[in-house]
Amino acid sequence: MKKIVVLGCGLVGRVIAEDLSQTYTVTSVDISQKNLDNLKSESISKICKDVSDSAVLNEIIKDCDLVVGALPGFMGYETMKRVIMAKKNIVDISFYPEDPFGLDKLAKDNNVIAVMDCGVAPGMGNIIFAHHDKMMKISDYECLVGGLPKKREWPFEYQAVFSPIDVIEEYIRPARYVQNKSLIIKEALSDTELVEFDEIGTLESWNSDGLRTLIQ
């Protein structure tokens, strides 16, 4: 059975590990024992270590077939780089600020498959766009994405659905998008507008830096 190491056992990493454990041999790694204790699947091996230490990381991933990165954004890029240098394939969901294409040559030189930005958006939004781009001619693309709690409570009616530090980062990092073939950079939370959704009601949207690789 394939061996997968999931780095990070937070809100998202925990779910990834539990889903994968139904089919694969999974090891979950986190610096917090409390996070690891929240895992429901007894088949998941747990390692409480700090993977910012290269020696620790290399020892943990040396026998695995695939690494899944689910660490906070500030750790994502460097961790992905070190996994590639260890010649391990990696799928990553971290919301880091660095340009992921900076790792392209390194991945090719090490014969590694490295897939970045595999969340909802960026991630699923990119895949949906690519699918429709094959099916029809697209001249404009706008992606609206959000995480909403089942129970909406004032004043924000919002809930952090991934690493809180990255939620904050999403709302302060400059937002980039392409208009008339030119790269436009605006402040996060700019150009607010109200959007209506059936059975949900009125929501507010604004610019955030979520297109990522689509900008290329």
Positions of predicted regions on the chain:
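Active-site-lining helix/loop region of Rossmann-like oxidoreductase modules
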Residues: 7, 136-216
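Hydrophobic/small residue at the entry helix of a nucleotide-binding pocket
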Residues: 12
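Conserved acidic E/D residue at the C-terminus of a beta-strand in Rossmann-like folds
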Residues: 28-31
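Helix N-cap at the beta1-alpha1 junction of Rossmann-like dinucleotide-binding domains, i.e.
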Residues: 33-35, 97
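Rossmann-fold cofactor-recognition segment
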Residues: 42-53
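Conserved Rossmann-fold cofactor-binding substructure of NAD(P)-dependent oxidoreductases
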Residues: 51-63
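Beta-loop-alpha module in the N-terminal Rossmann-like domain of NAD(P)-dependent dehydrogenases
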Residues: 66-82, 96-100
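Rossmann-fold NAD(P)-binding glycine/threonine-rich loop
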Residues: 93-116
